[in-house]
Amino acid sequence: MNKIRNSTYFIFSCVVSLILFIPNLIKSTIGSDWDSYALIGTFYNYDLVGLYTPSRPPGFPIYELIIGIIFKVLRKGSLLSPEQGLLIFQFFLVIILNFIVYRFINKSDQKNYLFYLLIVFSPMYLISGGSVIDYFLGAIFGFLAIYMVLHKYSSNYIYAYLAVLLSLSIGIRLSNAIFLIAILLYITIYKKNYTLSIYTAVLTMLLSCFIYLPFYANLYSFYTVNNIYNSPSEMICLLNLTNTDHTFIDRLGRFVLKQINFFGVIGFVLFLMLIKNARTKITENNFIFFIIFILFQFSFLRLPTEEGHLLPAFISLLLVFSNMKNFNSKILIATLTFTFLSNFVDFKVYSVNSIDSASDISLNASVTKGFFIEDYELRNNIALEKEFHYKNSQSTLFDAWKNGCPN
């Protein structure tokens, strides 16, 4: 009976996700961010021109390839539009990540499923999950690797399973190497299995190289033929991020504000009240999640743009708190309620001069549309000219990369 009752949380979350997914499916809108369209442009340049032009440095080859193939196949004629096919694929990823998070909660001592709902009903979780972007697929493989090392450690050939999962996660997004670092530290410090650490590290790096090198070699070949680069060392520019010309204060402002967006203003205040007396020690069970949280936060501080990059940190932090005792249940329920409501209506206590830089912040209380509603309207407006965005992303990416790295 307990298993049936506990699984209700997972089923309920999937039903809510489905309800919120349907409007986007009907409208066939793949996202409010240009990056969603850039993925298609990357695939078309590779498929039609024979040149790999990353949608963003340093490239996201596995996800770009998957999205491009789905788009191309459905473009030839199907009951579904290409956009609907991509959205259905993305929805399955949401269900899979929901289940992985649910399993972590279910394996914990406290089994606090309200934290599970707090994770999966966060506006940034729902928006990222409903957008054609790489965050969810990369997180799925990363957290599967964590699940294996925590709960399937005695499996035969675990180093091979870990290497495959981690290399897939890294092949989707290079910054997911943080999952590898956290797992290696855990195996070394708590399991003291240095052989497993070495095997996992070496095999993961080899497999990751097999994923990235063919695409990078394609781009380097183009540069050498056109006398743009003469040495492979010049390709290190692929690791440089774009749009980093902001002051530390600018980045810090954006960094702080985007943390709030996971809960909404009221939800964030309630969350701080909830955890203000929380005390926890780093243990074998939560060490990996602490490392994931810290390293992804530092990575985000370098370029605090899309909140989706913080999803592993957000999930990890709440998984740590979910296994702690003596939380005020009323405040936790209130936090969950207002976090979910912030998808539809949000109470702002500040305004910024620019969403992207947030260099000037003023106190200004107002009630605004929620994050999910704002994203829904924006993606609908962008989709009105989706054919333009597909073609424009292809030409824009080619122009950006044809003379060398754009950064």
Pin down the residues of each PLM region:
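Short acidic/glycine- and proline-prone juxtamembrane loop motifs at membrane-interface regions
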Residues: W34, R56-P57, I127-L137, T305-E307
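Membrane-lumen/periplasm interface segments of specific transmembrane helices
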Residues: S197-D250, V256-G267, S342-D346
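Signature aromatic-anchored transmembrane alpha helix within multi-pass, membrane-resident enzymes
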Residues: Y9-C14, Y113, A160, V164, ...
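Membrane-embedded, lumen/periplasm-facing catalytic core of multi-pass transferases
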Residues: L39, T335-N407
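Hydrophobic/aromatic-rich transmembrane helices and adjacent perimembrane loops
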Residues: I172, I178, L303-N328
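Hydrophobic, aromatic-rich transmembrane alpha-helices
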Residues: N2, C14, T188, L257-F287, ...
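Membrane-interface alpha helices of multi-pass inner-membrane proteins
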Residues: Y116, I158-R173, I181-L184, L206, ...
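Loop-to-helix entry region of an early transmembrane alpha helix in multi-pass inner-membrane enzymes
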Residues: P57-P61, L65, R75-I96, S128-S131, ...
